[in-house]
């Protein structure tokens, strides 16, 4: 090969026989018979100008064309080639970036639920470390730095979404100081790379120039043929390209020399390096934007929907919902059914018939069917066609206060309530912790202070938060003054009682003689025995003594203030007091029916006539046996009411008295006969804020002690007595015969020293009221003798709401209410041991726990308690090898199973079904009050095969 530097210089010898230029180029300098390389020729140094696929035909051009090739054209072509290379690199980088983003977006969505479910099924706690950059390898030093930076803590997570959010927060949310350090470090690295690149380029240019000068020394030598150097066979390489080592070096090195002087090359290289360095950060940024957009949509969907979602699962799957400060759907501690049921299904020891993992914020279709069935079952058992209208219900706090008062100060948790009863008991105790030591304490014993509670400091005393009784600071001194009565007053009272007329005395004796003998003997008991807090006994039907503890069958402990508990009902020898007789004369009560009169009078001693009670019991006993077969189905299906709380309604006005009206509750459930075990009315009695109490507060203690005799002589002994009358609904109170419509029911003595909520027994009145077939309201007239201006009854006085400046008037929350305790005649069966799926064999018929939350069902607005219950269901197989003969309930089932194993009854298979149920207690808002009802067969206790 020969180098020619002059365009006119050419090969002098004859061309090589049968051969042409190896490049098959159309250039004149290359078509002279052998390879003559011209340095300034573009076609000899640029591969793109050579037509390697062209034909071997020669197109000779005149020699003058070589002179027209200028240096400017060479520079333009080289710059054009450099621009094409830079654009190709940019296009490649952009295509790679878009492809990676699309692939990550496609593969991140389907794998999200699977990864989350696998992470939850495998383990609950995963220790996560901060991820390093793509170019950084994990090491002990980097882990130590990260631990020092973020603390020695581990994050407990249950799905992969939390890991992504934590990684993105650490990658994208850096502090300003770290960003500044990163920018400074990046600038230093850029300067160092630029300096190294310029030095390396300078060395390369020097090496190329030295090699080029060495090749110029052989310019006069002739070019040897390719056959002699390499032994080329043209039969094998026709139309192909063969490169020698010298040709490659000659083709590449001058191109670099030409491209190097172009100043734009350095800028393009720097831009490409920046793209490569920032490619990882840009990819993470795009992934974060796509991921955050999806999660924001999911958060909005969860927070705006009314579907069955749980607080725990929304916290796991949606981090931004809690970081943004928006309120969640469920914020209490109750456990919605989705959380417990999903955890119970996929974390039990039994691996039989497990379903595929479902998203945590949704409910499986099978669970939705169960929930709808449970809702229909509850409404049907309550005798309702739809959810009750609770647009304006009573406040739940007021309801719990009422239940607490009914309980008598101690809340007994029901097993059906679970943990909610315990929490409720603690909350109610805390609510009453603010009662001051000097305030009047109410212990649910009809205005008395239990001596057991005085001796035992552990006995819980409480005061209702609605009790705003005015408290005198010097109550001890004032109490001593009022209690110190002279003996002369007692003698005067006895002489006054003995001075009655003979007619009145005979009339009173005849009235008392008409009462049972046991009741008279009870009235003759000493006052010390009644005041000592001993066990008070009431004579039963057959002469046997019945204790007050016989009422312990109630859900709550009952201690009623019976009228026989007070000595003040009788005179000196057991006869009626003078004030009582005058009270009857004032009302002009006329009773033409003797039996009816005695029945009403006997309620004073809480002892009805013996023959009437025996007749009612025999009649009820006979009717219970007659209707036993008919009531079996109703008792097993409909709810069994145990307790009813009915608030008084404001009736008409009669003189200065307000009539109380109560609605019956026995019409809610079809074919259900309520049997009243006991009934009490709760009435609140307080002291008003009168002027003489204010003056008594300001009097010094010495002045009160000096004027003790004067107070005792002028101030009479105040006694409070409550009278209860029933008004007949068939007669209008505006008629002249109003006295005939009033029936006396009972009277009760109240101790003025212990005021507040009082409980009075009205069992006979309520039994007679519920015994009527018609659904008439109970109308009661309540009066107080001895109250005057000192004490007041809370009936229907309106008062402004506390803490509200508006003039809105609401009904007094201290209005009276009735508490009815019903009894159930259903027999209890012995409970057998149930097999849970947690400890059952593989495929065995077992009981699966299934929790139902009323809040998740949207029923927390009308169901007061409980917050939820375990409905449970059965699953498993009854045809496994574990089925032994003793597991069959009947011989017929065993016989059918043997035939099925023989192949004679292939179409029949036994099913795993519930065989034992239990009831659930429910307290809810009724149309007329608060009702507690036991719903039978609501909880699956045992599963088995037939």
From Swiss-Prot:
Keywords: Cleavage on pair of basic residues, Developmental protein, Disulfide bond, Glycoprotein, Growth factor, Secreted, Signal. It is found in: Secreted. GO terms for molecular function: cytokine activity; growth factor activity. Disulfide bonds join 837-846, 845-912, 874-943, 878-945. Pfam families: TGF_beta (PF00019). Cleaved in vitro by metalloproteases tok and tld to produce a 30 kDa product. Residues 128-142 have a biased composition (Low complexity). The record marks 585-586 as: Cleavage. Glycans are attached at residues 208, 217, 271, 389, 471, 484, 542, 561, 566, 732, 804. GO terms for biological process: activin receptor signaling pathway; glucose homeostasis; mushroom body development; positive regulation of glycogen catabolic process; positive regulation of imaginal disc growth; positive regulation of neuroblast proliferation; R8 cell fate specification; regulation of imaginal disc-derived wing size. Widely expressed in larval brains. GO terms for cellular component: extracellular space. Disruption phenotype: Development of larvae with small brains and aberrant photoreceptor axon targeting. PANTHER family: INHIBIN BETA CHAIN, TGF-BETA FAMILY. Controls several aspects of neuronal morphogenesis; essential for optic lobe development, EcR-B1 expression in larval brains, mushroom body remodeling, dorsal neuron morphogenesis and motoneuron axon guidance. Ligands Actbeta and daw act redundantly through the Activin receptor Babo and its transcriptional mediator Smad2 (Smox), to regulate neuroblast numbers and proliferation rates in the developing larval brain. Belongs to the TGF-beta family. This is Inhibin beta chain. It comes from Drosophila melanogaster (Fruit fly).
């Amino acid at each position: 090969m020969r180098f020619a530097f002059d365009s006119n210089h050419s090969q002098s010898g004859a061309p090589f026989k049968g051969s042409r230029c190896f490049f098959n180029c159309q250039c004149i300098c290359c078509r002279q018979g052998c390879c003559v390389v011209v340095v300034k020729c573009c076609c000899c140094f640029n591969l793109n100008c050579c037509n390697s696929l062209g034909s071997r035909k020669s197109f000779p051009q005149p020699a003058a064309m070589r002179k027209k090739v200028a240096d400017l054209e060479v520079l333009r072509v080289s710059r054009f080639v450099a621009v094409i290379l830079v654009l190709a690199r940019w296009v490649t980088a952009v295509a790679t970036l878009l492809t990676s983003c699309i692939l990550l977006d496609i593969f991140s969505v389907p794998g999200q639920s699977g990864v989350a479910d696998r992470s939850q099924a495998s383990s609950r706690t995963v220790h996560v470390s901060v991820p390093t950059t793509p170019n950084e390898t994990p090491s002990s030093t980097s882990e130590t730095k990260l631990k020092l930076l973020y603390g020695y803590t581990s994050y407990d997570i249950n799905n992969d979404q939390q890991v992504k959010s934590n990684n993105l927060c650490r990658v994208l949310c850096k502090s300003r100081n770290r960003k500044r350090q990163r920018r400074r470090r990046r600038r230093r690295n850029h300067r160092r790379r630029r300096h190294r690149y310029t030095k390396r380029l300078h060395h390369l240019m020097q090496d190329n120039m030295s090699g080029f000068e060495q090749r110029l020394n052989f310019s006069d030598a002739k070019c040897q043929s390719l056959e002699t150097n390499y032994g080329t066979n043209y039969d094998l390489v026709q139309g192909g390209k063969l490169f020698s080592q010298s040709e490659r070096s000659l083709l590449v090195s001058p191109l670099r020399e030409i491209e190097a002087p172009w100043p734009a090359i350095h800028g393009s290289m720097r831009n490409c390096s920046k793209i490569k360095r920032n490619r990882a950060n840009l990819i993470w940024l795009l992934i974060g934007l796509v991921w955050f957009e999806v999660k924001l949509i999911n958060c909005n969907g969860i927070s705006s929907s009314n579907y069955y979602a749980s607080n725990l699962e929304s916290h796991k799957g949606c981090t931004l919902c809690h970081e943004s400060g928006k309120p969640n759907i469920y914020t209490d501690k109750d456990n919605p059914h989705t959380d417990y049921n999903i955890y119970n299904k996929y974390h039990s020891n039994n691996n039989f018939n497990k379903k595929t993992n479902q998203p945590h914020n949704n409910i499986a279709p099978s669970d939705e069917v169960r929930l709808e069935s449970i809702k229909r079952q509850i409404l049907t058992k309550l005798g309702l066609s739809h959810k009750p209208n609770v647009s304006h219900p009573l406040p739940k706090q007021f309801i719990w206060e009422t239940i607490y008062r009914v309980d008598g100060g101690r809340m007994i948790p029901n097993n059906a309530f679970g943990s909610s009863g315990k929490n409720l008991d603690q909350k109610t105790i805390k609510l009453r912790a603010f009662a001051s030591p000097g305030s009047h304490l109410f212990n649910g014993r009809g205005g008395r202070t239990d001596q057991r509670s005085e001796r035992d400091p552990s006995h819980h005393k409480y005061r209702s938060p609605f009790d705003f009784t005015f408290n005198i600071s010097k109550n001890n001194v004032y109490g001593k003054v009022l209690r110190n009565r002279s003996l002369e007053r007692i003698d005067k009272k006895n002489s006054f009682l003995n001075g009655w007329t003979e007619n009145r005395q005979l009339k009173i004796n005849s009235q008392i003689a008409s009462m049972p003998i046991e009741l008279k003997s009870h009235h003759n008991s000493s006052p010390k025995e009644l005041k000592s807090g001993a066990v008070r006994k009431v004579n039963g039907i057959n002469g046997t003594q019945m204790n007050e503890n016989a009422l312990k069958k109630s859900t709550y402990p009952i201690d009623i203030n019976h009228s026989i508990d007070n000595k003040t009902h009788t005179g000196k020898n057991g006869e009626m007091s003078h004030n009582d007789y005058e009270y009857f004369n004032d009302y002009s009560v006329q009773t033409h029916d003797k039996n009816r009169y005695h029945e009403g009078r006997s309620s004073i001693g809480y002892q009805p006539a013996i023959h009437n009670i025996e007749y009612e019991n025999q009649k009820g006993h006979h009717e219970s046996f007659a209707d036993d077969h008919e009531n079996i189905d109703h008792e097993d299906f409909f709810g069994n009411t145990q307790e009813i709380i009915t608030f008084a309604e404001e009736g008409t006005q009669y003189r200065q008295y307000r009539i109380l009206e109560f609605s019956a509750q026995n019409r809610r459930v079809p074919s259900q006969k309520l049997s009243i075990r006991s009934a009490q009315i709760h009435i609140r009695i307080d002291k008003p804020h009168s002027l003489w109490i204010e003056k008594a507060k300001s009097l010094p203690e010495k002045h009160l002690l000096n004027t003790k005799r004067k107070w005792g002589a002028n101030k009479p002994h105040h006694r409070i007595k409550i009278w209860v009358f029933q008004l007949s609904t068939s007669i209008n109170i505006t008629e002249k015969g109003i006295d005939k419509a009033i029936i006396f029911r009972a009277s009760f003595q109240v101790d003025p020293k212990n005021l507040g909520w009082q409980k009075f027994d009205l069992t006979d009145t309520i039994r007679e009221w519920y015994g009527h077939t018609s659904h008439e309201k109970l109308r009661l007239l309540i009066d107080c003798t001895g109250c005057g201006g000192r004490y007041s009854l809370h009936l229907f006085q309106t008062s402004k709401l506390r803490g509200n400046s508006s003039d809105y008037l609401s009904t007094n929350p201290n209005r009276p209410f009735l508490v009815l305790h019903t009894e159930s005649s259903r027999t209890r069966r012995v409970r057998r041991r149930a097999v849970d799926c947690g400890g059952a064999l593989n495929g065995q018929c077992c009981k699966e726990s299934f929790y139902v939350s009323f809040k998740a069902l949207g029923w927390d607005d009308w169901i007061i308690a409980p917050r939820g219950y375990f409905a449970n269901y059965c699953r498993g197989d009854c045809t496994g090898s574990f089925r032994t003969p003793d597991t069959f309930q009947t011989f017929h089932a065993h016989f059918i199973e043997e035939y099925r194993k023989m192949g004679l009854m292939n179409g029949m298979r036994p099913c795993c079904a519930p065989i034992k149920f239990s009831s659930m207690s429910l307290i809810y808002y009724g149309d007329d009050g608060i009702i507690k009802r036991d719903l039978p067969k609501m909880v699956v206790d045992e599963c088995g095969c037939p």
